[in-house]
Amino acid sequence: KENPQSMRGVVISSVIGDGDWVVAVNYASANKIPINPDASTYDANAINFVPSQDDDYINSVKELIKSQKTGYTVPLKEVVNGKLTGKTLDRKIDGATTWTPGDKMAFDALSGFTDVVSTKDFVKQMATSIVVVKEWALQHEKQVIAILKQSYTAANQIKQYDEWAVKASECVAKTYNLETPKYWYDLFKGQKCTKDGLEYNIGGSKVF
């Protein structure tokens, strides 16, 4: 984190093209670190991304944990100055791009790791879109207006009133049948933690 150039040569498991990957690419660009555009190769002078299984951001973290704990590697063709050397290298995974709760999973399982960049640094990456079939939307104008109105109202209330944030956390826990409302509330607010003397951040949302 203190020396961005040390990211050169790392291998990161990621959903390539997803928003969390975009945040990492923005970080690389801001710090003038090359990105290897070929996920089947390894460039020691660039940040290398490998696709996570099933394009799943939770699998990105699971693959990082697996690599660090069991020595799991990915075979990558070596590239030097843009040219293949003919060698294939077995490289461990050094990091992952993910969304909460993937970050908490990683830090719970591993030591010696920290967060490097997040949507707190590139807040515009968190824009939200609602995708609908145009024909259906035109035929159901009242419903579409109601969806938008209620979404905007809820978002506004959650930002302003803590009891709404608590209720939203309860809804998430119930909807996904995962963890407790307090778990989600704390992660939505963001937590600064320390493990083995190393600080890291988990969670946190621009809406708050």
Predicted features by range, described:
Residues 93-95:
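Short, Asp-centered acidic motifs that coordinate Mg2+ and/or phosphate
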Residues 101-103:
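Alpha-helix capping/helix-boundary segments
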